[in-house]
Amino acid sequence: REKLEVQCQAEKVRDDLQKQVKALEIDVEEQVCRFIELEQEKNAELMDLRQQNQALEKQLEKMRKMDLRQQNQALEKQLEKMRKFLDEQAIDREHERDVFQQEIQKLEQQLKLVPRFQPISEHQTREVEQLTNHLKEKTDKCSELLLSKEQLQRDVQERNEEIEKLECRVRELEQALLSVQTLSKRWRTRNSFGAVEPKAELCLEVQLQAERDAIDRKEKEITNLEEQLEQFREELENKNEEVQQLHMQLEIQKKESTTRLQELEQENKLFKDEMEKLGFAIKESDAVSPQDQQVLFGKFAQIIHEKEVEIDRLNEQIIKLQQQLKITTDNKVIEEKNELIRDLEAQIECLMSDQERVRKNREEEIEQLNEVIEKLQQELANIDQKTSVDPSSLSEEADSLKHQLDKVIAEKLALEHQVETTNEEMAVTKNVLKETNFKMNQLTQELCSLKREREKMERIQSVPEKSVNMSVGDLSKDKPEMDLIPTEDALAQLETQTQLRSSEESSKVSLSSLETKLLQLESTVSTKDLELTQCYKQIQDMREQGRSETEMLQTKIVSLQKVLEEKVAAALVSQVQLEAVQEYVKLCADKPAVSSDPARTEVPGLSQLAGNTMESDVSALTWRISELESQLVEMHSSLISEKEQVEIAEKNALEKEKKLQELQKLVQDSETKQRERERQSRLHGDLGVLESTTSEESGVFGELEALRAESAAPKGELANYKELAEKLQEELLVKETNMASLPKELSHVRDQLTEAEDKLSHFSEKEDKTEVQEHGTICILEPCPGQIGESFASQTEGAVQVNSHTQTPQIPVRSVGIQTHSQSDSSPEEVAEIISRFTEKIEQMRELHAAEILDMESRHISETETLKREHCIAVQLLTEECASLKSLIQGLRMPEGSSVPELTHSNAYQTREVGSSDSGSDWGQGIYLTQSQGFDTASEARGEEGETSTDSFPKKIKGLLRAVHNEGMQVLSLTEGPCGDGEDYPGHQLSESWLEERRAYLSTISSLKDFITKMQVQREVEVYDSSQSHENISDWRGELLLALQQVFLRERSVLLAAFKTELTALGTRDAAGLLNCLEQRIPRTEY
């Protein structure tokens, strides 16, 4: 048995092993299929990547070609500019050579024409030698300039070669990019087996991070180089400005030197004429005695000495001119260097753009490589999860991966070598920049030396003027001695003296003109300072005016808000009164239908007519009230839009404030610059500086004119705001007229009510007579609480509907009639239970109302305060900005002072508005109080008049109804405020808790109405079932009418007393206000 069991188990094990082997074979086949599919997919991806790389290579070649073309075009343009510049310089130098040759020829001719005296000839030979030396020096300088030109051309060629080298480097970098792409391909192939050796991946990631760090460092270096280039540009601009100023001064000095040279040439001609005349005189005077000849020779020696002094002065002037020519040549060299520096900057910018482009391409390629690596890693992870790898295949793959890693490392070394080459290139560029810095420093030093030489030139120019004055004085002293010379010599000397005097006078005139110009400029500066001070004063005045205007506008806004609140409250109170009167009329019309005599059949028709008329009037009034509410909503929306406009205007005002501050800074800077330049002009006499200050002042005034144009825009905005305010006032007046028409309609409705009451009293008298005749005795009737309750319920319903502003359908009041067939017995226990329920509900509602009332009050107060503050701040800012702009404009238009327009708004109108709003609020409060007091007194009067009824539950119902009414009126008074304060509370945005409370409130009112109708039906059935009752007791309807009349009389007396107090308070101060009050109060008090 054991053997059999062992055999069976062995067979089972063998079967299991065979099954496992089959399953493993199936798995292996599936894995092989998957590997084949993966290899196919990888091959397809590799083909796609090759195609993409080929496309990228083509695009790169195209981009290279385009870049090379652009660079070649730019270089050709630069070469053309350089050629043109060199041609122009060559033309200028040839022109200068021609001028120098002409001057040399003139000087040679003058030397030939000079008479041949022995002492004079030696001196002139010396001068000729000096001049020849000067000419040799000038020719040497010209040759040096030619050599410098050739050097510049060589520098241009060297830089072109450098540009070509840089292009070769760019190509090398592109090749490096291609090698990076090949690396990326190999990386992808390697990462397909990345799960085997994660260490290699980590090494590659570390290398990538190192490359990225190196790229970041290079970017930082590039940014630093850019900043240095910007600094060099600013320095170059400043130096170019200084060079331009020096050019201007040199041109002025050239003009002065040319004028002086012309004068000296004229003097030389005159001197030659004099010498010829003297030679003739000497020939004629051979017969003169030797003593006279000695005197004449002594005088001639003096004259010759004076002329030698003049010749020395002329030589000094020639030296100065030569120095000026040197300065001009130096300036030209500086300009050439500046142009070369600009060219270098342009080349550096091109290189920077190329480097940025290469860097961006590298980053994009690295991102693509990272994405591909991530995808391959995910695929490998999935494959590793699904399949298991054989050790032999793993070893082969590891060997292949090691081989690939070796290749990648070699390529990385090549890349590092390329990075080192790029670093070396960056170092070369840094050296170039340092050289440019050194050149710039040299140029600054040269400019400083040129300035010093210029100052020396100015000092030297002042010296010959003094010598001229001294020579004039010597000539004036020697006049009596020269009287012995013949008349021709005297005339020649007089001519020279007159010429000297004319030159002195011209110099004096020029100096006086310069002094007058300086005085004019100083006066203009002082006037402009005064204008600026006036502008500042006017700005302050306009700010104060703006503040006063904002305060006036705030007071007007507050008064208008109060008027709106009071009018809304009055409209709501009138609506509640109309609804109460309408329901009372319905009840009064339904009651006479109880009578059973045929004479009572006339009553329902009349009551229906009165009810129809009342319903039509009430519907018209409700329609008008809804229109007023819609207008209020529009007003709220317009206020919101105005607030938005005010915010926009505030932003514009802030921007204009910033602009004004900038202009003030510019004005201050210009003032400081003016002072500094005035000092410089006084020290050096530089008129160019003053001209620049005047130009800057003109620029500042142009900016002020632009500000004037900009300030016209806020003026237009202010005008628009004023127009909007006027429109709002007109709309308020229209609404006031509509509200004034409402009391007239109310009085008309009240008249109709009085007529209906008279008819009802007449019919009630008839009913009393018939009842006395039929029954003889009538039981004592308590005043029916159903009517009062229903009237109060209707009032509360109206209050809830007004507060919620939702179009909820009113709950229809059940018509109370005599239902003889429906007799319902109600025990006192049920009544007590109902009363307890209602009391509990009322207490819950009171608690909820108290909590919500507190929340509403706090929210309302906080929101109103925030809105008022924001509005006040906005208006203040706007008015201040507008005032400042107005003051600026007026100050610029009227520099002597402008009369500030005073805001004379009508205070009488404001006081009238406030008075009318106060009177309207007093009237609304009086109506509200008298109405509530009237209902309370009427109910109390009817309760205290002593009906002998055994049941006590109607009094409890009265108390419940009073509580409900009081809470409804509290809700009314609280919910009317936010609607009038300018806050927009539409009906569809009410909270859910408020809607639930309203529903509970309406359900309690409907249940009360049902209960009251039941009690009323029961009472009336008992009255008509009882055959005998007391005789001499009046009907409850007559008592109710008397109570209503008393209430209305009390209202009238209260209103008359209030009116008298207002009349005594006002007196005869405002006749128009009194008339308005009378017109408003007469239709209200007439009842």
From Swiss-Prot:
Domain-related comment: RII-binding site, predicted to form an amphipathic helix, could participate in protein-protein interactions with a complementary surface on the R-subunit dimer.
Signal peptide residues on this chain, from the entry's feature table: none
Gene symbol of the encoding locus: AKAP9
Any Gene Ontology biological process: signal transduction
Subcellular localization, as worded in the UniProt entry: Golgi apparatus; Cytoplasm; Cytoplasm, Cytoskeleton, Microtubule organizing center, Centrosome
Alphabetized UniProt keyword annotations: Coiled coil, Cytoplasm, Cytoskeleton, Golgi apparatus
Protein function: Scaffolding protein that assembles several protein kinases and phosphatases on the centrosome and Golgi apparatus. Required to maintain the integrity of the Golgi apparatus. Required for microtubule nucleation at the cis-side of the Golgi apparatus. Required for association of the centrosomes with the poles of the bipolar mitotic spindle during metaphase. In complex with PDE4DIP, recruits CAMSAP2 to the Golgi apparatus and tethers non-centrosomal minus-end microtubules to the Golgi, an important step for polarized cell movement.
Compositional bias segments (type: Basic and acidic residues): 667-685
GO molecular function, one term: molecular adaptor activity
Region (PKA-RII subunit binding domain) residue spans: 559-572
PANTHER family, alphabetized: A-KINASE ANCHOR PROTEIN 9 (PTHR44981:SF1), PERICENTRIN-LIKE PROTEIN, ISOFORM F (PTHR44981)
Record's keyword annotation contains Cytoplasm: yes
Record flagged with keyword Lipoprotein: no
Organism of derivation: Oryctolagus cuniculus (Rabbit)
Protein name: A-kinase anchor protein 9
Subunit structure: Interacts with the regulatory region of protein kinase N (PKN), protein phosphatase 2A (PP2A), protein phosphatase 1 (PP1) and the immature non-phosphorylated form of PKC epsilon. Interacts with CIP4 and FNBP1. Interacts with chloride intracellular channel proteins CLIC1, CLIC4 and CLIC5. CSNK1D binding promotes its centrosomal subcellular location. Interacts with GM130/GOLGA2; leading to recruitment to the Golgi apparatus. Interacts with KCNQ1; targets protein kinase A (PKA) catalytic and regulatory subunits and protein phosphatase 1 (PP1), to the heterodimer KCNQ1-KCNE1.
GO terms under cellular component: centrosome; cis-Golgi network; Golgi apparatus; Golgi stack; synaptic membrane
Domain of life: Eukaryota
Region (Disordered): 667-691
Tissue expr: Highly expressed in gastric parietal cells.
Coiled coil ranges: 5-461, 614-773
